[in-house]
Each structure stands twice: as C-alpha cells, then as structure tokens.
C-alpha cells in the first residue's frame, strides 16, 4: 500500500493547506524556495528548491564542457562577476583549478582564492513554458550565480548537490549567459576541509533541467521484505495525480504497490527493481521518473546489526574522492575500477569519508552490491559546533545529503561528521535526521577512540551522550577490540581502524578475526583505500644528479615519480595512507586485506593425503549465500614446478559455517618432491578474490639440495662484493621514520672487524664449513644492551652487480613480516631487480636462487628462513635474518620489536652454493626456471616512497 508519513493530520506550509490522500500523498506548495532563517554565516536554502531532480533524458541537458575562468587571490564575496577579458583562461567543467595550473595545491585548508566563471547555454525549444532549473552536483566551496546579469542563487556547501530555478532570469530565445563566483573560504567553509587535499572549482556535473509548473517536489521509497512498497510523493500544484508501477530487472511490470515473493537486496544479491512514477494532469502525463530500488530492511536487535533479519559483517574501507590526474573529478571508469578491486578484496562496505560522493557512485553501489555509510559533510570546523548560528548550516548539509541519497538501498547508515566533539547542536542534529529526514536508517557519529572511551570511563559524564543507535569509534588496539568493545549495548562499527601508512599494516589479521567472531561488532573500515595523490610536474630528479644523496632516484622522498619530472605529490606522509597508490596500483597491504577479508577459503595450512584423497576444511563468510553455485574453487595439484592435474568444485556450504570437503587426487604424491595444492576462488560475477597454495605432505628440502648439488663450482664469495656483513636494521618505512627517530641505525649493514668478532655494536660468531659442494654458515649475534631498535638482525651479502634476478621457494610473492604475512603463500616465485614488489623480507623460505641473466650466481638455502632482498646502487643485498620486527601500525610501535637490549643472542644457519652458468646441476633445473624466462619487472614508477632506492655507501658502516 502507498502510504504517507503524516498520519492523516492536516499540516500548514506557508499558509497553504497540505492535501493528503491515502494511496498518494499530494502536497501543494508554492514555487518559492524553502528558506531557513538568514544567519550571520549564510543564507540557508533548500538544496532542491522544491523540485525532484528529473530522470527523463529529454528533460535534462548537460552543461559540462569548456568554460571560461579567472582566478584571483583573496576572497571576493561581494563583487558581481567581472566582464571577461584576455586574462581569462579556459577550463573543462568538471575540472579542478589545480589540475590546470590556475592555482597551487593546498592541503587541509583551501588557499584564499576567488574564481570567476562564465559560459553560455541555450534552452531547448521544446522546454518553452516550463520551469528551467540548474543543478550543480559539487562546487568547491561556496558560490553565487547570475543568469543574464540577474542573481540566481547562492550555495555554501561544496560537496552537496544544489539546484536553482532560473526561469525568471532567462531572456527569450538564444544564448543565455551564466556567470558564477566561487570562493574558497567563508564562515563554515571549514566543514568542507579534512585531512585531505583542498582543491577548488566545479568538480562535478552541471545539468540544465526542465520541469512543468505542476511537478513532483520529492519522492521517498520505503520497502518491506514482504514485498510492500510505500511511496511518499510531494507535488507542487493542484489537481494532479501520481501513478506508480514496479518493474523487475527484466523490465516486466510486477505490481503497483506490492511485489509477490520479492528478490531481496543485499550486497551479495544486489537485485534492483524499477519504480516508474508518472505525474498526470487532466489525464495527460506531464512528468515521468524512473528510480531503481531494492527490497531490504535494516534492523538493530540488541547490539546486533541485521539486514533482512540476518546479522551482517561490514568488511570495509574508507574512500576519499581521489584521482591523481584530475584531483577530485571522478570518472565512471575510475569508480568501476575501484569497485572491481574492492570486490576482488571481498570489500562489501564503503564509508564515504568525509562527504557524500558523486551521484553515480551510489547507482554503482546499488547495482554492484556495496553497503555504504554516507557522510554528512562537516569535517573540520570544530570551533563552530558550539555556536548556535551554525546549527542551520548542519541542518542544510544533512538535508541536502539525505534527500538526494535516501532511496538508494546501498545506503545503510548516515554518518554525521567526522571525529567532532559531541556538542549540543551535533546531538540535536541526530534527532533532526531521525525525526525529520529519515526514520528508516540509523545514524552515527564517528569518534576518535580515546574520546569515545572517555564517556564510559567517567571522564565525560556517564555514558554516551547521544541516542545514536550505533557506536562508531576509531583506531582501537587489538586488546581493546578483544576487551572494551566486546559487550557494548549497541552495535559497534569501527568507521576507521588499522590505519595504513605506506607499507605499514600490522595486526589487521588479528583485529579482523576478533571482529569476525564478535556478534556485537558489525565491522569496520580500514583507513584508507587509496593514496591522496596530487599531480605535480616539478621537482624533477635532478637533485640526485647534483649530488644530493637524500633525494631523487636514491634516497627517500614522500612522492611517487612516474617519470623523472612528473608524478604524485602526497603532501609529505599525510596522503601516503592508501591500500593502493594514487593511480590504483596495489601496495602489498591490499593483498593482505584481500586475504584477511576473504569471503570463502580453505582453512588448512598443511594437507596430508589419505587413500588417494585430500580432506579440506572450507569456511564460508558470506552472510546470505551458500557457496554452492555461487563460488568456484579452481584447483591445481603440482609437484615441483609441474602441474599434474586440475579441477574445480563448488561446495555446499551455508553462510557462517565451515564444512569438510574431500578432494579426490588421481595421482599419488611423490614424497621426494615439493607437492602443492593451488586454490583460486572466484565468485559468480567473475571476481577472483583469493589465491591459496597449501603444502601437501611437506618435508625438509635441505637434504635433497645437499645431495643434488653435484657440480663443483667454486667459492660462493666469488660473487660477493664486500664480504660477510651483519644486518642490524633495514631501510625505514614511513612509519618507522616517525616512530624510530634516534632509535634505529641509519647505517644498518655492518662490516666485520679485522678479527671477525664484532660488527659495530654487535658481537658476532660466524663459522663456515664445507657441506658437499656448498658452504654451511652458522652464526650467533649478540647486540649491545642499548635501546636501539634493530628491526632486522642477520647475515647479509652484497652480490655481484650483474646478479639482477631472484627466484625462491617459500612464501611470496610479496614481502612478509610479523603482523603482516597472511598474503604470503608457499610456492615457487621469481622477481627481477626493479620490480615494484622486489624488496623486502620473505618468510618461510627454503631456497633462493640469485643469478644474472645467464644463470650464474648464488643459491642460498635454509630451513623455513627469513630472507631479505634489497636493491642498492651497487647491486642486490641478500640477507638471511635470524630476527625480524614488525613494521607497526601508524599510531603505535610494532607489537613484534627487535630491541638490542632485549633480544639477547640470536643464531641461525644457512648454506651457500656458487652456481656456474655453464655447469648447472639438474636439481636447479628441476626447481627453478631459466633466468631468461623470468617476467620483466613490473615497474609502474621510476621511484616511490617506502620502496625507494638507497646508495650502498649510505647504509653501510
């Protein structure tokens, strides 16, 4: 049944009576704008001016394209737009000024600038007699409009859509002149600033629309899982009738106010219906709308968040609008690329930090299947939140956000601001949202974790001061997730957690596993999806050529260079917090997230055969879908590098459970070889979201290597440039540079003393002895008793400069560290020097072959060891590490430190074998590829932070 929310009461709007009908709600209002009181901050207007945005393509026209622009220093909020002259430039709309050289980039807060725009447009002849409306989907930050010299409107919220009825400003036929003044600062503009770039300009679509004098002003869709549809409509004018029909995904009419046995919408089953709404006047259709919607019900049961009666887990990320070339102009292609990568990482939830996204984003979230926490934009500006005059500003922003996005099934929750103090007007805003804008969804206040916890520790009164139905604290420790947040009285969503910083992403696996098994914690969103990169074409790598060893090609810079004079600027380390680089190249952390968030997986780390079968244990972390017919496990069984058999299956496994699965293996495993079961897991939409490789009947590889290295080939040290080194640290990550200032060794490759007993502050006992045709190295290292953080401790070698490729048997292909190792899987891996993912520690290594292109070089083998590959200007440094620290999260020290005074004595052993390219043992042919067949290095950048290059002499003592 079509219902209205007014309960049959008679209401008054500006003296005009609201007319209510049982099936259709007709509200008569005037054509004038809704105006809130004029305050000292801004004229607060209804963002949509009593007009429902049209969906009929014949009733709208894009004004995107080339406009004229002049940018001047300072804020001019009084002068009308000046006459265009030769000082004006051209800019595409949408387009940010910074991307086209009109101003310099600024972070956190926009520079004080004013931009003047001019363009012209024609009104289609078919629209004569209709109301003409301009729609701006986003302009940073505040703006005023003139059409043909007449003031047409004003808006002061950069990330919100606003519309303007310009009918009375038009002049006859022909070109209409549009002028616009954009200012970057005004009272309340802080609400549009965040820990983010602060660009300027018209950055979203501009659309011209036509509406009849009698028209729809608003439309709200509500659904029940039983198939009932409630549509509330608001009509401007008298005597009109609204009719609805519901179409299924194939375009077939299935009802008008109810659908029998509806398909329910979830992120796993994003089935969309279409509501076709027709406004008729005297029996003639004068407006037609089409809105896609889904049947779903969101409820809270105690402290459990449920969708369609089922508890759900939100596997999330936060996501700024970021394009490294166009700044904040986001194309469909880029959003689709993001969402494809998210699906492949099993992400099912996006927080639109810290503002509503462009309209197309929500359409794609609806159709592809994502849950969204949609954010009302007030980021900075805390000082304003104790001032009553800013309450209407918050109301305006909430109204503009919610009215635009309320019919999207993907939007589950409204987020009110970000990390703001909970002042009186913030708390009242929540009540306003719930009672006046949308009673069907919960709202929340994302909070700094320490601030949130104060409410429960008696430091900020007693209990949380708002009835917000969901708690949304930030950055809990692993212990807090396991303790403090376990039994809250409302659902908990960590709207920011496990902050990435460069390649630091420690402990996400443990945090997510606790979230996964705790009913009252509904999920979380990792900060941040993508680096906040701004294009730059200055600061070329010439500094390196001029002898500055701390910059350019060799040395740390908080930038990504795509060429020697262009790349992405991240404003120091503030914007280097993405799972992806700004151009969407994944960092290793992306693959760690992919493994930890996986919707389905084989839980076994080792498999054994029994009666010609492998018994697997399979876990399903979908909330609604059985794996049967929805997920495919493609598998391959290999021995050494030979794949012997392949297959695929789709197990019968209900949501939230684990089941055994027996896989028939038609060939008996050869115990003398390395046997692996490789699993690739793909959903029904073709998104491959997990790769696994699991050892089958594993055994020690070392005896096989010692027996198989039959060729005598000389001293391994003949391909080593600088003798035996002690590694007592590593190249610092972004996080370590901040947290370990004065605590780490900047020169961490230490040469042995003349007697071989010390290396810098470390006592060393290193012994070598022949082992067949290899050399066996045993060592013990004892650091001094200082607070020095060593990060890595072991034995290292600078290899001959011609050695430029590595192959290894162990965990890969990405670097792995304590607290960040889940993405590593056992197998046969290879990289060439220069590859983006070349450097770093690998865990669980049994053998590593380092050669030149012809196959000459060095074989290092060990038992389940840590082996590090590092690039320098003089060649590759390979290390066998006896101790490795974690890389830490952003805000805290690593939970896995290697501190000199605490580590005591560490020891280890490994073997080296000199490989002669002209006399390679058959075993090496069996286990490794010929070096010439190794794939070319993946090198999307010239250099980049965290995997930057260093000069050997700068890191050696």
Report residues per predicted region:
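Extended substrate-binding grooves/exosites of carbohydrate-active enzymes
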Residues: 46-53, 59, 93-103, 190, ...
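Intrinsically disordered, low-complexity Pro/Gly/Ser/Thr-rich segments with frequent PxxP/GP/PP motifs
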Residues: 258-260, 641-672
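Beta-strand/loop-rich accessory regions of lumenal/periplasmic or secreted enzymes
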Residues: 138, 184, 266, 670-672, ...
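Glycine/proline-rich low-complexity spacer/linker segments in large multi-domain proteins
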Residues: 46-54, 152-153, 173, 177-210, ...
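Extended acidic/polar, glycine-enriched regions
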Residues: 171-175, 232-301, 671, 678-679, ...
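Extended carbohydrate-recognition surfaces in non-catalytic/accessory domains of CAZymes
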Residues: 43-135, 186, 190-194, 199-202, ...
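An acidic-aromatic loop/edge-strand motif
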Residues: 99, 168-231, 235-237, 248, ...
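Accessory beta-strand-rich segments of carbohydrate-active enzymes
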Residues: 49-54, 70-74, 112-216, 253, ...
